[in-house]
C-alpha cells in the first residue's frame, strides 16, 4: 500500500477515460476493498472527490472526481512516475573577472529535439572575449530541456524572449562602445546591470514556460473531452437509426390493424342491420295480430292458435337473445379494438418523444429535424386516412335485402270477413257471390 501512497500526485492514462491525476489511495466508507481516487481534470467524472458526505480529495472541477477499485488500476499506478515540478527560480550571479574585461552578451540559438514543436526552442549563453572568463548558462539550458518534453511551443513567448534578449544586446553594445580602459567603476556597474537583466530575463522565461504548460494542459483537457464525446455521438446516431426502424414497423402494424378493424366493423354493421330488420318485422307482425284479435273481439283460446303464437313468441325470444348476444359480442370486440388502437397510438407517441429526447447537438441536429418533420407529416396522413375510412365505412353500408319476400299470413288459417267464419277468405265466400246457387 505504501508504494501506491507514494505515487499520489502522478498522472495515469486510464483506458476509455483519458488522463487523470491520482489523488487518493485507501478505503471508502460503506464499500469493501481499496479504492483509488482520480481527478480526470474535466467534467467527465461522477463526483467532486467526496462520497456519502465525506471528502476524500480535492478536484479541479465539480464533476471531475472518480473512485476506481485499486486492483483495476494498480498496474497503471506502478508504471506511472512522479513528474518533476520544481524549477530553478534563481540564477547564480556572474563572476566578475579580475582583469575587468568587457563581458559581451551573445545569443546562440540551438534547435531542440522536439518532434511536436514546429519552431525550435532558443537558448542563450554568455561568452567572454577571453577563454578564461567564459561562463555558460548550462543550468538554464537544462531547465529548457526539462520543459521541452511537454511540446506545443508558444510563439508569443518566443517573441517576448527575443525582445528581452535584443534589449540586452543593445545595452551591452552601448556599454562596449562607451567603455574606457581607465574607468573600472563603470565596468562594475555595467556587469551588475547585465546580471540583473539576465535574472529578469530568466524569470520572464520561466513565467512564459508556466503559461505554456498551462495552455498545454488545457489543450489536453479539450482533446480528452472530444474523445469522450465522440462515442456519445456514435451512440446517438445508432439510436436514431433503431428508432426509425421501430417507427416504420409500427406504422406498418398500425395500418394492418386499421384495415382489419374496418373489415370487422363492416361485417358486424351488416349483421346488426339484418338482425334489426328481422326484429322490427316480427314486432310489426305481433302488433297486426293483436289488432286483428281486438277488432273481431274473439278469444284466442283455440289450441292451434295458442300453439302457433307460442312458437312465434319463442322464435321472437330466440331471435332477441341472439340479437343481444351479437350486440354484446360486437360491443366487446369494438372495445378491444379500441384499446388495442389506443395502445398502439401511445407506443407510437412514446417512441416519438424518445426520439426527440435523444437528439444530438452537432451535425445530427439537422437529421433529427428532418426526421421530426417526416413524423409530423406521417401523423397528418394517418389522421386523414382515419377520417376517410370513417366516412367511407358509414356511407358504404349495404341496404338489407331479404333473400325472399316474407309472407305475413304463412302458417295461419284463412278467415272470411264477410261471414265471420274460418276456412275460407273473403274472395271465396259463397254468401258474398250472388251467382252461387248453393245458398239462397
Swiss-Prot record:
Gene Ontology biological process terms, A to Z: 2-micrometer plasmid partitioning; cell division; establishment of mitotic spindle orientation; karyogamy involved in conjugation with cellular fusion; microtubule nucleation; mitotic spindle elongation; negative regulation of microtubule polymerization; nuclear migration involved in conjugation with cellular fusion
Domain of life: Eukaryota
InterPro entries attached to this UniProt entry: CAP-Gly_dom_sf, CAP-Gly_domain
Keywords: Cell cycle, Cell division, Coiled coil, Cytoplasm, Cytoskeleton, Microtubule, Mitosis, Phosphoprotein
Modified residues annotated as Phosphoserine in this record: 95, 110
Region listing for Disordered, in residue ranges: 108-157
One Pfam assignment: CAP_GLY
Coiled-coil regions listed: 190-397
Record SMART domains: CAP_GLY (SM01052)
Residue ranges with Polar residues bias: 125-139
UniProt biased composition (Basic and acidic residues): 141-157
GO cellular component, one term: microtubule plus-end
Domain CAP-Gly: 26-69
Molecular-function GO term, any one: kinesin binding
Purpose: Required for nuclear fusion, chromosome disjunction, and nuclear segregation during mitosis. Probably required for the formation or stabilization of microtubules during mitosis and for spindle pole body fusion during conjugation.
Miscellaneous section: Present with 300 molecules/cell in log phase SD medium.
Protein's name according to its UniProt entry: Nuclear fusion protein BIK1
Source organism of this protein record: Saccharomyces cerevisiae (strain ATCC 204508 / S288c) (Baker's yeast)
Amino acid at each position: 500500500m505504501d508504494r501506491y501512497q507514494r505515487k499520489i500526485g502522478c498522472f495515469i492514462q486510464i483506458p476509455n477515460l483519458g488522463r487523470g491525476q491520482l489523488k487518493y489511495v485507501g478505503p471508502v466508507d460503506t464499500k469493501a476493498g481499496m479504492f483509488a481516487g482520480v481527478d480526470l481534470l474535466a467534467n467527465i467524472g461522477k463526483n467532486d472527490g467526496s462520497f456519502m458526505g465525506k471528502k476524500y480529495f480535492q478536484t479541479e472541477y465539480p464533476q471531475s472526481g472518480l473512485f476506481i477499485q485499486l486492483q483495476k488500476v494498480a498496474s497503471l499506478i506502478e508504471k506511472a512516475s512522479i513528474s518533476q515540478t520544481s524549477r530553478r527560480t534563481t540564477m547564480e550571479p556572474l563572476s566578475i573577472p579580475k582583469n575587468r574585461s568587457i563581458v559581451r552578451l551573445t545569443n546562440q540559438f540551438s534547435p531542440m529535439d522536439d518532434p511536436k514543436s514546429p519552431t525550435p526552442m532558443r537558448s542563450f549563453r554568455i561568452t567572454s572575449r577571453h577563454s578564461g572568463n567564459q561562463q555558460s548558462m548550462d543550468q538554464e539550458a537544462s531547465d529548457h530541456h526539462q520543459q521541452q518534453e511537454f511540446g506545443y511551443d508558444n510563439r508569443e513567448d518566443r517573441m517576448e524572449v527575443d525582445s528581452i534578449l535584443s534589449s540586452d544586446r543593445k545595452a551591452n553594445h552601448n556599454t562596449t562602445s562607451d567603455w574606457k580602459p581607465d574607468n573600472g567603476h563603470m565596468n562594475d556597474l555595467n556587469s551588475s546591470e547585465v546580471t540583473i537583466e539576465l535574472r529578469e530575463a530568466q524569470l520572464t522565461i520561466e513565467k512564459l514556460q508556466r503559461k505554456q504548460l498551462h495552455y498545454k494542459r488545457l489543450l489536453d483537457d479539450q482533446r480528452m473531452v472530444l474523445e469522450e464525446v465522440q462515442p456519445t455521438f456514435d451512440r446517438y446516431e445508432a439510436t436514431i437509426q433503431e428508432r426509425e426502424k421501430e417507427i416504420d414497423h409500427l406504422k406498418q402494424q398500425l395500418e394492418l390493424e386499421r384495415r382489419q378493424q374496418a373489415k370487422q366493423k363492416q361485417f358486424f354493421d351488416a349483421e346488426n342491420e339484418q338482425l334489426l330488420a328481422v326484429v322490427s318485422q316480427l314486432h310489426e307482425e305481433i302488433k297486426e295480430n293483436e289488432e286483428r284479435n281486438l277488432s273481431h273481439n274473439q278469444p284466442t283460446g283455440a289450441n292451434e292458435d295458442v300453439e302457433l303464437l307460442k312458437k312465434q313468441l319463442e322464435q321472437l325470444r330466440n331471435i332477441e337473445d341472439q340479437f343481444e348476444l351479437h350486440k354484446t359480442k360486437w360491443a366487446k370486440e369494438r372495445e378491444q379494438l379500441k384499446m388495442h388502437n389506443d395502445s398502439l397510438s401511445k407506443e407510437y407517441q412514446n417512441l416519438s418523444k424518445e426520439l426527440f429526447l435523444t437528439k444530438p447537438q452537432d451535425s445530427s441536429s439537422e437529421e433529427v429535424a428532418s426526421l421530426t418533420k417526416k413524423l409530423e407529416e406521417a401523423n397528418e396522413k394517418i389522421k386523414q386516412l382515419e377520417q376517410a375510412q370513417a366516412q367511407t365505412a358509414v356511407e358504404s353500408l349495404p341496404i338489407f335485402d331479404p333473400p325472399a319476400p316474407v309472407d305475413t299470413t304463412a302458417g295461419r288459417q284463412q278467415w272470411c270477413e264477410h261471414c265471420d267464419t274460418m276456412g275460407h277468405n273473403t274472395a271465396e265466400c259463397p254468401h258474398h257471390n250472388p251467382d252461387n246457387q248453393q245458398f239462397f
